[in-house]
């Protein structure tokens, strides 16, 4: 069965790399994958979106991902972006956040949270003043959806950065996996 994942964040948070790492992890598990970003000529801090398709079979569909199964929001500061647009009714929204949002804000979808910013700051994953939360969110996604294993996420991270950077990001992914907070049915 094919699953679609849409990532939302701001330039500099690692949205595109998150999509690439998820695709690499799924590929390591023998799954069919597609990964593609969507952004304009914006700079660091501007909204960025990336998409991933994961399937047990080769993917022959080539086009935009309008109805994802899962949406991952890396930035808690995307006020002007409707992150739930097109999210399937049985979909899951993974949010980088600490407090409870108003129940009507994400009406009708399952919501899972992890305070990825706090974890990133604690681990020193900060670049130019931005907490880089992508690998933390991937760990949480692995636990929430079981689309890929945490081990595959960590292997993809270490393949991309085979040094201390990889070790720190693999640790970050595990913390995202372990510190994921419960699923709520909003609305």
PLM feature spans:
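Active-site cofactor/cluster-binding pocket
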Residues: 1-187
